[in-house]
Amino acid sequence: MAFTLRRAFCHMSVFWMPGAVVALKIHPANNVQKAVRDCLRVWFCSLQPDLFRVRFYHAYCKSFHSENGNDLHPVGEPWFSQAQVWNQPEQTLKNEDEEMLSRRLNSFASFEEVLSFIHTLDTLPVTLASAALLRICEIGKRDDEQRLPKEVLENRVFQALCLRCERDPSHLTNAVLVTVLQSLVIDPQSSLVLSLVAECQRRLRRGSLEVHHLCVLGESLARLQGASCEILKLVICQLQSENLETFAPEDIVSVYRILQACPEEVDKHQTFLNTVNNFSLSIVSYLSPKSISHVLTALVALDQTHARPLLIKLGKSVVRYIPRFTNEELRQVLEAFVYFGHSDRFFTEALEQHVAAQCFSLDPAVASSVMEYCSRKRILSKPIFDVVAEIFVCQSEKFSPSQISELIEPFGKLNYLPPNAPALFRKVENVLFAHLRHFPPKMLLRLLHSCSLIERHPVNFMSKIFSPFFLQRLQGKESYLDRLSLAQMTQLFLTSVLECPFYKGPKLLPKYQVKSFLTPCCSLETPMDLHLYKSVVIGLIDLLGSRLYFASKVLTPYYYTIDVEIKLDEDGFVLPFTVDEDVHTRVALCIDGPQRFCLGSKHLLGKEAIKQRHLRLLGYQVVQVPYHELELLTSRLELVDYLQRKLFSQSSTVHW
């Protein structure tokens, strides 16, 4: 048997190796495998690499399983699996070979290239495995992906790499350790994550992690284990002891994101936050659009309203980057500006250019966010409003109910009708008819009320909103209807009476009608500018001769509050405000401060326009005294002359 085996091997040219033949001659047949194994291994792997790969694939095509479904461990792993081959002590690489392989790894530009290359290796030291993992994570970051895609996480070679590193994380570099943690999207309680976190904790306590690694680790811990993680608290404590001058711009962004994950501890970290806010002023110009949106989002979450210098500087950078923001980043920027009340002319102009350039490709979420920003800041940008109106008419099916509400309400609030107003509101009506049940009651009420502000009265829906069923839905589980909803319902009811006399449907019951539209918390009127009011009162006293001839802040029977009311008899003479008999005409003097107009314009807001419109329909003679006219007056004499022209013009029936 031994002779036959030796002769057969010796007659095969491919087996003609001195080591193998000698081994066969010396050792009996039953020891052939043991004696020849070492000599054949190098030959076998070099001769038939494809056979080795098939065996690797077969071993690692087993399904992976864990109790939580996320552990990167194979079930029923055969003894000759890839991970075990990589772990065999007999297989080592020379330093120069390992350096060459590392250089090749760094030359790859895709996940597939790295994984295919690792697939072909017979030997994989931990250092090379960690380099491969790092390269995979770097490719993900280059593609703007903080987390690795699912197809990579489920790849068998990648899973084998993770298993290799999990078994011996102490050999991983700091960069690999924190980067892999950052890139993995698996269960925080998986054995791989726990192993890597434990190793991070050991290095953290030794103080061997640099600033950048601390920042990456902190972000990963906040994502994986939340703000209550004890290790995260250690990371924050160590970051506070570091010199901010050593932080790269992306590290500062990471600090904000780490603290953002702990909003309940903002008071505890406020001193550190103040230092970071002040230092960040020097790095704003180095921040990418993505980083700027991250910082602004963190400032909102941490309620850093006092960081105005930083916000202003970030706002200037935002102007340059608007075309480069992703839809989500731009939406976050707009939300931050709304939260902090920030706006400037240059940002609005850049936003107008961006919306016009995007036009019909503008994302619905961004379009609604842009409109909400304009609404909150009272910015009447006709280019933006016109484009958005066209987008909605052509692509209304892309918008959700909440986005439709955010899109349409600003038209009413800012008192603007776009050129395609008939088509726009016809489309709104059609959408409401088709999807009315998808609009929550309060959202529907806000939408219909905003339409009425610009004389697009929702007559076809009034019977629905005045019905007991809608009022019940509007109240929901609360014990009462909120004050703002009742005020909007009341104004819609008044609109139906004054502007829609043909409406014959249900009316709003008196018990649901408010007594005044002017309230501190939820007003449908803008409070009077006290500085302007005092100036006008002085002028009126000089003009009329006494304070007895006019009344201030008069609540009418029709829910509106008049700034100044002057009563006239049938001949047009001014009556004392205490007289109720013989009153023929009531003059409503509207002292309109800047808050009653769109920002930086002479265009009245919708709620002020409907008020003046209703007062005229109720028989009042409305005289408007806007701030931009009062600001031109330089003396008390000019003020009196101005009021005289307003009240006693030739076309007026008022007599002095």
UniProtKB/Swiss-Prot annotation:
Its main location: mitochondrion. Residues 587-645 form the RAP domain. One of its GO terms (molecular function) is RNA binding. Keywords: Mitochondrion, Transit peptide. The keyword Transit peptide applies. GO terms for cellular component: mitochondrial matrix; mitochondrion; ribonucleoprotein granule. Disulfide bonds: none annotated. InterPro entries: FAST_2, FAST_kinase, FAST_Leu-rich, RAP. GO terms for biological process: mitochondrial cytochrome c oxidase assembly; mitochondrial RNA processing; positive regulation of mitochondrial translation; regulation of mitochondrial mRNA stability. It is found in: Mitochondrion. Pfam families: FAST_1 (PF06743), FAST_2 (PF08368), RAP (PF08373). RAP domain is required for FASTKD3 function in mRNA stability and translation. Required for normal mitochondrial respiration. Increases steady-state levels and half-lives of a subset of mature mitochondrial mRNAs MT-ND2, MT-ND3, MT-CYTB, MT-CO2, and MT-ATP8/6. Promotes MT-CO1 mRNA translation and increases mitochondrial complex IV assembly and activity. Belongs to the FAST kinase family. This is FAST kinase domain-containing protein 3, mitochondrial. It comes from Rattus norvegicus (Rat). The lineage of its organism: Eukaryota, Metazoa, Chordata, Craniata, Vertebrata.
